[in-house]
């Protein structure tokens, strides 16, 4: 029950953040064909966590862990005896990981551009890792509705086929990106599959 109350409370906080102008990673749109895009992303910094379980289980647990970090379970760099709240950004991204222990996923939040890796508060939870992501090319497909496993599989296959028709090389795993709070109606939701690519 306490977990449910926490998630509802966080959902309202997230909804408030998303009602205002919320920051997203900076990218340049290089190509657009219907729902497909090729983007060149600038470098950004993330907070991430690796979690076990099904997609839904891992999403809930990973979300809670990183949200706990940005809401203040951390140590400020400038004042180590104090914590620091970090603004919510979008999207929240999940990526499948290889694990001998069963299903595993890596979830990350992009940190606001006002921070650099060296200036981010230190997590109190060792499961939270901070790292920089370099610039790179990503193919993307946008869709609404719920991010069910079948929807993710269908959109990923569509995007992979588009990449193949362009003659690009896939350089990493597909990422599921979600941009909305839990209270957004399914038909208004913005979801994306992102796949890192390399042009010949």
Sequence positions of predicted segments:
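A solvent-exposed interaction/effector surface
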Residues: 3-6, 12-200
């Amino acid at each position: 029950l306490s977990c449910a109350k926490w998630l509802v409370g966080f959902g309202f906080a997230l909804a408030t953040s998303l009602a205002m102008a919320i920051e997203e990673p900076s990218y340049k749109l290089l190509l657009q064909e219907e729902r497909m895009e090729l983007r060149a992303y600038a470098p950004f910094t993330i907070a991430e966590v690796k979690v076990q379980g099904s997609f839904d289980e891992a999403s809930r647990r990973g979300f809670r862990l990183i949200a706990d970090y940005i809401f203040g379970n951390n140590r400020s760099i400038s004042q180590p005896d104090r914590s620091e709240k970090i603004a919510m950004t979008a999207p929240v991204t999940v990526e499948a990981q290889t694990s001998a222990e069963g299903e595993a996923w890596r979830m990350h939040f992009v940190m606001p551009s006002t921070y650099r890796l060296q200036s981010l508060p230190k997590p109190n939870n060792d499961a939270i890792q901070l790292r920089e992501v370099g610039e790179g090319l990503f193919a993307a497909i946008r869709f609404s509705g719920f991010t069910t496993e079948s929807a993710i599989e269908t959109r990923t296959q569509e995007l992979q086929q588009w990449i193949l028709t362009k003659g690009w090389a896939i350089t990493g795993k597909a990422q599921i990106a979600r941009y909305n709070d839990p209270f957004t109606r399914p038909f208004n939701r913005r979801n994306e599959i992102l796949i890192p690519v390399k042009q010949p």
